[in-house]
Amino acid sequence: MRDNMLQVDHHDPENLSLLRFNALWESNYRNNSLLVFSTGRSPTLYKELRKEKPMLTPDITIMSVGTEITYGNSMVPDNGWVEFLNKKWDRNIVSEETSKFPELSLQSETEQRPHKVSFYVQKDKAQDVMKALATRLQERGLDVKIIYSGGMDLDILPQGAGKGQALAYLLKKFKASNKLPVNTLACGDSGNDAELFSIPDVHGVMVSNAQEELLQWHAANAKNNPKIIHATERCAAGIIQAIGHFNLGPSTSPRDVTDLSDSKMENFDPAYEVVKLYLFYERWRRAEVENFELYLANLKAVCCLSGIFVHPSGIEQSLHDAINSLKTCYGDKQGKQFRVWVDQVLPAQIGSESWLVSFKKWEQSGEAWSTLY
């Protein structure tokens, strides 16, 4: 599980850290792991972020500070979670009581959700407001949780809500269906991520750019917990660092591999080969490939002579011809902000030596994005 805000580094205009993670996940983890995005953002702001940044498609999305859980591309809501959060929750009472605090400034309408009421509050007033508000709401018969994060955001949720509780709910659900993950890595950077690290048997990483309130929580509650680390890398790079630190699996992104030409049939992995192919394609068009003839030869070696590349338009072309056609576009994006990444790489073996691989390919050239399925 990772917070989709923490993986996005707004100080990295080319999104290289995020693209490194994308390549690692799609080449090594997509087919046998679950990618969960957990964010304080509402569905509206989350979808806006996905339009701005090269983010992968998660298997599960947790939004609005753990009050909304959805599944898959269609973001199907978890109705069981909704029913659970309705207990001892009355949004009208919350709105009535918070209106009595002039220190609170209501956030935009998009951030107000069925089980989340969100405000801005000055840092020096936050603790006093939270204490007084909690007392008022308890006196009104509500059981709520008040979360302060980002040095200004104050969210009021049902007591059973939150990123940590949402994760615990999912793990319980997986266990009941005998699908409990072998390992779970929770990643965070703000105060509303703290409870993620309180879930038993979960590995945790605070990225190097974690905010003050999360660092304070760590110092007070988990400083000597070996399952929780403070990474030295920012954002998505910190997640990669944690995967390596806890030995959870491969932690070298294909984007960190200089020579992509080495393809050994005994270690053949179709997902890894697809990721490598489009990394090569990016470098090829940016004129960053040396010894390209050797790479093309190795690429053909792992492709069956009868292999077919099916374009999203439906046009079929032999894999070898598709590889040869690369020669016509070498260096046409040299010096430009051109990046390529793949999403939802899903291989299926259809014969003893045959694979069908479906994926989405994205390209960014300057500010323009395009995709092929």
Q: Can you name each region flagged by the protein language model?
A:
Residues 1-14, 197:
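Asp-based phosphoryl-transfer active-site loop
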Residues 93-199:
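Conserved acidic, metal-coordinating active-site core of Asp-based
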Residues 290-353:
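A solvent-exposed, acidic/Ser-Thr-rich amphipathic alpha-helical stretch
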Residues 102-103, 340-345, 358, 368:
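Short structured motifs
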